[in-house]
Amino acid sequence: MVYTKDLEANWNVFPVSGYHDRLTTKRRIALLIDDGSWKETDSKLVSKDPLKFTAGGSYPERLAQHQKKSGLRDSVVCGHGLMDGLPVSLAIMDFSFMGASMGSVAGEKVTRAIERAIKLKCPCVVVCASGGARMQEGILSLMQMAKTSAALAKLRSAGLPYIAVLTNPTMAGVMASYATLGDVIVAEPGALIGFAGARVIKETTNQDLPDGFQTSEFLLKRGLIDMIIHRKEMKSKLASLLRALAHRKVKVKAVKSRA
C-alpha cells in the first residue's frame, strides 16, 4: 500500500515496483521547469466543430466535459521557461483530456512551441502521450502529423536541438510524427509506444506477439528510442543532453576520391 501523499512526493512513481503512473500537466511542469520561470503561451486556443460530429454526443459537449474535468482547454499545454537554467520551449500532452488525442489545437500548439524555439533560439522539448488522432476532427486531425513534422524540419535547419519524451501511452499519429523525430528520443520506463494496438496487430497478422511488445524497454533494445530515463532523473538528464546538443560543432572535411 502506498499513501497518496507519498506517491505524489515521488512524482507518481510507485516505490517498490517502479511503475510510472501518469502526471498532470501542472506536476510535469513542476518536474521539468525551474521554479518561477514558466510562462504559458497560446492558452486560449480551443477547437471548433468543423464536422458537426455527433457520435457519442456532440463534439462541443465532449470538449466542455473534459475542460471542466481536467481544467485544461485541450490536450496540449505549451510555453517556455528554464530547465536547470537553460532556456527551453516546452509542450506537454495530457492524457486526461480526451486521451491526449491530437486535434487541430494540439497540433497548432506543438507547432507554435517549435516555432517559438526558433524565434527564441532555444531547444524544444515535447512530452508526448496520446491515444491517437481525434476522430471528431477527421482529416484536420491527421493533417497535424505533416504540419508538426514540417515545423521540426525548420527547427533542424536552424540548428536547434529537439528532444521527444515518450510517456505512457504514445500511440498512433503522434508516434508516427513528432514523437519519433527527435535528435534524441527518450522514454519513461514501461511506456507503451506504438502505432496500432497489440490486439489489432495480432488480429491482422494472426501471429503471437513477443513479450513486452511495444514497451519502451522492448523498443530500446531494437533502436527505436535512445534512452529510458527514470522520472526523478528526467530534468537533469534532459538538461545535460540539451547542453551537449546546443554546443555541438561538426566539421566535415572533404575527402578526395582515390578512384
Language model segments and positions:
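Terminal-region recognition feature
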Residues: 1-163, 169, 181, 188, ...
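Short glycine-/acidic-enriched loop or helix-start segments at secondary-structure transitions
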Residues: 136, 174, 196-197
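Active-site-adjacent loop and "lid" segments of alpha/beta metabolic enzymes
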Residues: 138, 199-211
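Gly/Ser-rich catalytic serine loop of serine hydrolases
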Residues: 167-177
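Nucleotide-binding motor/catalytic cores of P-loop/tubulin-like NTPases across gene-expression machines
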Residues: 188, 193-204
